[in-house]
Protein backbone atom coordinates (compact mmCIF):
# COMPACT_ATOMS: atom_id res chain seq x y z
CA UNK A 1 0.00 0.00 0.00
CA UNK A 2 1.50 3.31 -1.11
CA UNK A 3 1.33 6.32 1.22
CA UNK A 4 1.02 9.71 -0.51
CA UNK A 5 1.45 12.91 1.48
CA UNK A 6 -0.33 16.13 0.53
CA UNK A 7 1.59 19.38 0.19
CA UNK A 8 1.20 21.81 1.74
CA UNK A 9 -0.28 20.37 4.92
CA UNK A 10 -0.36 21.19 8.62
CA UNK A 11 0.56 24.41 10.35
CA UNK A 12 -0.04 27.73 8.60
CA UNK A 13 1.64 31.04 9.43
CA UNK A 14 -1.25 32.18 11.63
CA UNK A 15 -1.15 29.01 13.71
CA UNK A 16 2.64 29.15 14.02
CA UNK A 17 2.37 32.73 15.25
CA UNK A 18 -0.39 31.99 17.75
CA UNK A 19 1.48 29.07 19.31
CA UNK A 20 4.70 31.10 19.42
CA UNK A 21 2.91 33.91 21.26
CA UNK A 22 1.78 31.53 24.00
CA UNK A 23 5.18 29.83 24.20
CA UNK A 24 7.05 33.13 24.42
CA UNK A 25 4.67 34.48 27.06
CA UNK A 26 5.24 31.33 29.11
CA UNK A 27 9.00 31.83 28.78
CA UNK A 28 8.98 35.50 29.76
CA UNK A 29 6.20 36.06 32.29
CA UNK A 30 5.17 34.54 35.57
CA UNK A 31 2.64 31.73 35.23
CA UNK A 32 -0.21 31.14 34.85
CA UNK A 33 -0.81 32.64 31.43
CA UNK A 34 -4.49 32.70 30.52
CA UNK A 35 -5.66 31.96 26.97
CA UNK A 36 -9.22 32.77 25.92
CA UNK A 37 -10.46 29.76 23.95
CA UNK A 38 -8.17 27.08 22.51
CA UNK A 39 -5.39 29.09 20.90
CA UNK A 40 -5.74 26.77 17.90
CA UNK A 41 -8.16 23.88 17.46
CA UNK A 42 -5.87 20.97 18.26
CA UNK A 43 -5.89 18.98 21.49
CA UNK A 44 -2.25 17.88 21.15
CA UNK A 45 -1.11 21.50 20.91
CA UNK A 46 -3.38 22.69 23.70
CA UNK A 47 -2.33 19.90 26.07
CA UNK A 48 1.33 20.69 25.42
CA UNK A 49 0.79 24.33 26.32
CA UNK A 50 -1.25 23.38 29.39
CA UNK A 51 1.65 21.28 30.63
CA UNK A 52 3.84 24.39 30.50
CA UNK A 53 1.46 26.55 32.54
CA UNK A 54 -1.11 27.92 30.11
CA UNK A 55 -4.68 28.02 31.42
CA UNK A 56 -7.41 27.89 28.79
CA UNK A 57 -10.74 29.58 29.54
CA UNK A 58 -13.83 30.42 27.52
CA UNK A 59 -14.80 33.69 29.24
CA UNK A 60 -12.91 36.60 30.74
CA UNK A 61 -14.73 36.28 34.07
CA UNK A 62 -12.68 33.12 34.64
CA UNK A 63 -9.50 35.23 34.68
CA UNK A 64 -8.29 37.12 37.80
CA UNK A 65 -7.79 40.88 37.49
CA UNK A 66 -4.35 42.11 36.38
CA UNK A 67 -3.55 38.78 34.72
CA UNK A 68 -2.10 38.16 31.27
CA UNK A 69 -4.62 37.04 28.65
CA UNK A 70 -3.93 35.83 25.14
CA UNK A 71 -6.69 35.97 22.54
CA UNK A 72 -6.80 32.90 20.31
CA UNK A 73 -5.98 32.80 16.59
CA UNK A 74 -9.72 32.96 15.84
CA UNK A 75 -10.09 36.51 17.16
CA UNK A 76 -12.52 38.13 19.60
CA UNK A 77 -15.37 40.63 19.48
CA UNK A 78 -14.95 44.30 20.35
CA UNK A 79 -16.98 43.64 23.50
CA UNK A 80 -14.43 41.08 24.72
CA UNK A 81 -11.53 43.39 23.92
CA UNK A 82 -13.20 46.32 25.72
CA UNK A 83 -13.92 44.21 28.80
CA UNK A 84 -10.32 42.97 28.96
CA UNK A 85 -9.05 46.55 28.85
CA UNK A 86 -11.58 47.68 31.47
CA UNK A 87 -10.24 45.04 33.84
CA UNK A 88 -6.61 46.00 33.17
CA UNK A 89 -5.77 42.59 31.79
CA UNK A 90 -2.47 42.55 29.93
CA UNK A 91 -3.43 41.51 26.39
CA UNK A 92 -1.42 39.64 23.81
CA UNK A 93 -3.42 39.22 20.64
CA UNK A 94 -2.81 35.97 18.75
CA UNK A 95 -5.58 36.70 16.25
CA UNK A 96 -4.40 35.61 12.81
CA UNK A 97 -3.55 38.71 10.74
CA UNK A 98 -5.78 37.37 7.97
CA UNK A 99 -8.71 37.23 10.40
CA UNK A 100 -7.85 40.77 11.49
CA UNK A 101 -8.16 41.78 7.82
CA UNK A 102 -11.79 40.60 7.86
CA UNK A 103 -12.36 42.40 11.17
CA UNK A 104 -11.17 45.64 9.57
CA UNK A 105 -13.55 45.15 6.64
CA UNK A 106 -16.50 44.75 9.01
CA UNK A 107 -15.38 47.71 11.12
CA UNK A 108 -15.20 49.94 8.03
CA UNK A 109 -18.67 48.85 6.94
CA UNK A 110 -20.01 49.53 10.43
CA UNK A 111 -18.53 53.03 10.54
CA UNK A 112 -20.10 53.88 7.17
CA UNK A 113 -23.48 52.41 8.10
CA UNK A 114 -23.19 49.77 5.38
CA UNK A 115 -25.01 46.54 6.13
CA UNK A 116 -22.66 43.55 6.19
CA UNK A 117 -23.27 39.92 5.26
CA UNK A 118 -20.81 37.42 6.73
CA UNK A 119 -20.46 34.00 5.11
CA UNK A 120 -19.53 31.56 7.86
CA UNK A 121 -20.47 28.78 10.26
CA UNK A 122 -22.83 29.59 13.14
CA UNK A 123 -21.11 29.17 16.51
CA UNK A 124 -17.52 29.13 15.24
CA UNK A 125 -15.34 31.42 17.38
CA UNK A 126 -13.98 33.23 14.33
CA UNK A 127 -17.53 34.05 13.25
CA UNK A 128 -18.47 35.24 16.74
CA UNK A 129 -15.43 37.52 16.81
CA UNK A 130 -16.07 38.90 13.33
CA UNK A 131 -19.79 39.52 13.96
CA UNK A 132 -18.73 41.37 17.09
CA UNK A 133 -16.82 43.99 15.10
CA UNK A 134 -20.08 45.52 13.87
CA UNK A 135 -21.57 48.17 16.13
CA UNK A 136 -23.79 50.42 14.04
CA UNK A 137 -27.44 50.09 15.07
CA UNK A 138 -28.47 51.94 11.93
CA UNK A 139 -27.04 49.18 9.77
CA UNK A 140 -26.79 45.49 10.53
CA UNK A 141 -24.70 42.35 10.13
CA UNK A 142 -26.16 39.06 8.94
CA UNK A 143 -24.74 35.53 8.90
CA UNK A 144 -25.32 33.17 5.98
CA UNK A 145 -23.84 29.72 5.43
CA UNK A 146 -25.59 28.38 2.34
CA UNK A 147 -27.27 29.44 -0.88
CA UNK A 148 -30.57 28.62 0.85
CA UNK A 149 -29.73 31.10 3.61
CA UNK A 150 -29.23 33.80 0.99
CA UNK A 151 -32.65 33.08 -0.52
CA UNK A 152 -34.29 33.69 2.88
CA UNK A 153 -32.25 36.77 3.77
CA UNK A 154 -33.89 40.17 4.12
CA UNK A 155 -31.86 43.37 4.53
CA UNK A 156 -32.74 47.02 5.17
CA UNK A 157 -31.10 48.51 2.08
CA UNK A 158 -30.13 46.24 -0.80
CA UNK A 159 -28.21 49.10 -2.43
CA UNK A 160 -25.82 49.52 0.51
CA UNK A 161 -24.36 46.08 1.22
CA UNK A 162 -20.95 44.50 1.77
CA UNK A 163 -20.07 40.80 2.12
CA UNK A 164 -17.08 39.09 3.71
CA UNK A 165 -16.32 35.55 4.83
CA UNK A 166 -14.80 33.34 7.47
CA UNK A 167 -11.22 32.52 6.47
CA UNK A 168 -11.46 28.72 6.66
CA UNK A 169 -14.44 27.88 4.46
CA UNK A 170 -14.77 25.64 1.43
CA UNK A 171 -13.57 27.67 -1.54
CA UNK A 172 -16.16 26.11 -3.87
CA UNK A 173 -19.11 26.42 -1.48
CA UNK A 174 -18.24 30.02 -0.68
CA UNK A 175 -18.07 30.88 -4.39
CA UNK A 176 -21.61 29.50 -4.76
CA UNK A 177 -22.85 31.65 -1.87
CA UNK A 178 -21.17 34.76 -3.30
CA UNK A 179 -22.80 34.08 -6.67
CA UNK A 180 -26.17 33.83 -4.92
CA UNK A 181 -25.54 37.10 -3.06
CA UNK A 182 -24.61 38.91 -6.28
CA UNK A 183 -27.69 37.52 -8.03
CA UNK A 184 -30.04 38.63 -5.25
CA UNK A 185 -28.27 41.90 -4.42
CA UNK A 186 -26.63 43.18 -7.64
CA UNK A 187 -25.23 46.28 -5.90
CA UNK A 188 -23.41 44.31 -3.18
CA UNK A 189 -19.71 45.03 -2.72
CA UNK A 190 -17.04 42.67 -1.44
CA UNK A 191 -13.39 42.60 -0.39
CA UNK A 192 -10.74 43.46 -2.96
CA UNK A 193 -8.95 40.23 -2.03
CA UNK A 194 -10.75 37.04 -1.05
CA UNK A 195 -11.17 36.54 2.69
CA UNK A 196 -10.54 32.78 2.51
CA UNK A 197 -6.89 32.60 3.48
CA UNK A 198 -3.97 31.33 1.42
CA UNK A 199 -3.49 28.30 3.68
CA UNK A 200 -7.11 27.19 3.36
CA UNK A 201 -6.91 27.59 -0.43
CA UNK A 202 -3.58 25.76 -0.71
CA UNK A 203 -4.62 22.83 1.48
CA UNK A 204 -7.85 22.39 -0.45
CA UNK A 205 -5.93 22.54 -3.74
CA UNK A 206 -3.56 19.88 -2.39
CA UNK A 207 -6.51 17.60 -1.60
CA UNK A 208 -7.95 18.17 -5.08
CA UNK A 209 -4.64 17.08 -6.58
CA UNK A 210 -4.24 14.08 -4.28
CA UNK A 211 -7.79 12.71 -4.15
CA UNK A 212 -7.72 11.15 -7.63
CA UNK A 213 -4.45 9.36 -6.84
CA UNK A 214 -5.57 7.53 -3.69
CA UNK A 215 -8.34 5.18 -2.59
CA UNK A 216 -8.65 6.61 0.93
CA UNK A 217 -7.63 9.98 2.40
CA UNK A 218 -6.81 10.58 6.06
CA UNK A 219 -7.15 14.15 7.31
CA UNK A 220 -5.29 14.78 10.56
CA UNK A 221 -7.22 17.43 12.45
CA UNK A 222 -9.61 18.13 15.30
CA UNK A 223 -13.35 17.62 14.98
CA UNK A 224 -13.88 21.31 15.83
CA UNK A 225 -11.35 22.50 13.23
CA UNK A 226 -13.24 24.21 10.42
CA UNK A 227 -10.49 23.94 7.83
CA UNK A 228 -9.88 20.25 8.62
CA UNK A 229 -13.55 19.43 8.17
CA UNK A 230 -13.56 21.21 4.81
CA UNK A 231 -10.66 19.02 3.62
CA UNK A 232 -12.55 15.83 4.46
CA UNK A 233 -15.71 17.12 2.82
CA UNK A 234 -13.82 18.09 -0.33
CA UNK A 235 -12.36 14.60 -0.74
CA UNK A 236 -15.79 13.05 -0.19
CA UNK A 237 -17.28 15.33 -2.87
CA UNK A 238 -14.58 14.15 -5.26
CA UNK A 239 -15.55 10.53 -4.63
CA UNK A 240 -12.62 9.60 -2.39
CA UNK A 241 -13.47 8.12 0.99
CA UNK A 242 -12.01 10.38 3.67
CA UNK A 243 -11.67 10.17 7.44
CA UNK A 244 -11.01 13.02 9.87
CA UNK A 245 -8.74 11.74 12.64
CA UNK A 246 -7.23 13.32 15.75
CA UNK A 247 -4.17 11.11 15.66
CA UNK A 248 -2.81 7.65 14.83
CA UNK A 249 -4.93 5.95 17.50
CA UNK A 250 -8.04 6.65 15.39
CA UNK A 251 -6.73 4.76 12.35
CA UNK A 252 -8.67 1.52 11.79
CA UNK A 253 -7.29 -1.45 9.89
CA UNK A 254 -10.67 -2.13 8.23
CA UNK A 255 -10.37 1.12 6.24
CA UNK A 256 -7.59 -0.32 4.08
CA UNK A 257 -8.93 -3.68 2.91
CA UNK A 258 -8.15 -3.94 -0.81
CA UNK A 259 -6.59 -0.47 -0.85
CA UNK A 260 -3.61 0.29 -3.08
CA UNK A 261 -2.90 3.89 -2.07
CA UNK A 262 -3.74 6.02 0.96
CA UNK A 263 -3.35 9.78 1.13
CA UNK A 264 -2.52 11.78 4.24
CA UNK A 265 -3.00 15.49 4.83
CA UNK A 266 -3.39 17.69 7.90
CA UNK A 267 -5.44 20.74 8.78
CA UNK A 268 -3.76 24.07 9.43
CA UNK A 269 -3.75 23.54 13.21
CA UNK A 270 -2.36 19.98 13.20
CA UNK A 271 1.37 19.55 13.93
CA UNK A 272 3.60 17.44 11.68
CA UNK A 273 4.43 15.09 14.57
CA UNK A 274 0.86 13.74 14.37
CA UNK A 275 1.26 13.12 10.62
CA UNK A 276 4.46 11.19 11.23
CA UNK A 277 2.73 9.05 13.86
CA UNK A 278 -0.04 8.29 11.35
CA UNK A 279 2.58 7.25 8.78
CA UNK A 280 4.13 4.90 11.34
CA UNK A 281 0.71 3.38 12.00
CA UNK A 282 0.05 2.95 8.26
CA UNK A 283 3.37 1.15 7.87
CA UNK A 284 2.27 -1.26 10.60
CA UNK A 285 -0.84 -1.93 8.50
CA UNK A 286 1.09 -2.69 5.32
CA UNK A 287 2.08 0.72 4.02
CA UNK A 288 5.47 0.80 2.35
CA UNK A 289 6.53 3.49 -0.09
CA UNK A 290 6.00 7.03 1.24
CA UNK A 291 5.78 9.74 -1.43
CA UNK A 292 5.52 13.51 -1.00
CA UNK A 293 3.01 14.80 -3.53
CA UNK A 294 4.29 18.14 -4.91
CA UNK A 295 2.33 21.28 -4.14
CA UNK A 296 2.44 25.02 -3.50
CA UNK A 297 5.44 26.13 -1.45
CA UNK A 298 4.58 28.37 1.50
CA UNK A 299 7.06 30.93 2.84
CA UNK A 300 4.74 33.28 4.72
CA UNK A 301 5.73 34.21 8.29
CA UNK A 302 3.75 36.43 10.68
CA UNK A 303 5.78 38.19 13.38
CA UNK A 304 4.94 37.94 17.08
CA UNK A 305 4.41 41.15 19.10
CA UNK A 306 7.62 43.11 19.77
CA UNK A 307 7.32 42.59 23.54
CA UNK A 308 7.58 38.81 23.02
CA UNK A 309 10.55 38.76 20.64
Swiss-Prot record:
Residues binding (2E)-4-hydroxy-3-methylbut-2-enyl diphosphate: 41, 74, 124, 167, 225-227, 269
The cofactor(s) it depends on are: [4Fe-4S] cluster
Gene3D superfamilies in the record: 3.40.50.11270, 4-hydroxy-3-methylbut-2-enyl diphosphate reductase, catalytic domain
Q: Where does [4Fe-4S] cluster bind?
A: 12, 96, 197
What EC numbers are recorded for this enzyme?
A: 1.17.7.4
Q: Where does dimethylallyl diphosphate bind?
A: 41, 74, 124, 225-227, 269
Q: Where is the active site?
A: 126
How is the cofactor bound here? Binds 1 [4Fe-4S] cluster per subunit.
Q: Where does isopentenyl diphosphate bind?
A: 41, 74, 124, 225-227, 269
Q: Which reaction does it catalyse?
A: isopentenyl diphosphate + 2 oxidized [2Fe-2S]-[ferredoxin] + H2O = (2E)-4-hydroxy-3-methylbut-2-enyl diphosphate + 2 reduced [2Fe-2S]-[ferredoxin] + 2 H(+); dimethylallyl diphosphate + 2 oxidized [2Fe-2S]-[ferredoxin] + H2O = (2E)-4-hydroxy-3-methylbut-2-enyl diphosphate + 2 reduced [2Fe-2S]-[ferredoxin] + 2 H(+)
Superkingdom: Bacteria
**Per the record's keyword annotation, is Iron included, yes or no?**
yes
Q: Does the keyword Transmembrane apply?
A: no
A GO molecular function held by the record = 4-hydroxy-3-methylbut-2-enyl diphosphate reductase activity
Record's keyword terms, sorted:
4Fe-4S, Iron, Iron-sulfur, Isoprene biosynthesis, Metal-binding, Oxidoreductase
Q: Which pathway does the protein contribute to? A: Isoprenoid biosynthesis; dimethylallyl diphosphate biosynthesis; dimethylallyl diphosphate from (2E)-4-hydroxy-3-methylbutenyl diphosphate: step 1/1; Isoprenoid biosynthesis; isopentenyl diphosphate biosynthesis via DXP pathway; isopentenyl diphosphate from 1-deoxy-D-xylulose 5-phosphate: step 6/6
HAMAP family referenced in this protein's UniProt entry, alphabetically: IspH
Family, similarity comment = Belongs to the IspH family.
Name of this protein: 4-hydroxy-3-methylbut-2-enyl diphosphate reductase
- Per the UniProt entry, what species is this protein from, by scientific name? Pseudoalteromonas translucida (strain TAC 125)
Q: Give the gene symbol.
A: ispH
Amino acid sequence: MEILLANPRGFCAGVDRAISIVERALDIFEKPIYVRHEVVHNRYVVDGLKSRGAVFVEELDQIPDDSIVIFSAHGVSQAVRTEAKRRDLKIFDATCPLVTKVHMEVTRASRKGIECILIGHQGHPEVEGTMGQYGNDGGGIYLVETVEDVAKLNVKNADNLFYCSQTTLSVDDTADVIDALRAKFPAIDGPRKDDICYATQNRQDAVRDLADKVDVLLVVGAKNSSNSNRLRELADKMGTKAYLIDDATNVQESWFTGINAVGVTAGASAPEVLVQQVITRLKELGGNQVTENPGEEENIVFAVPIELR
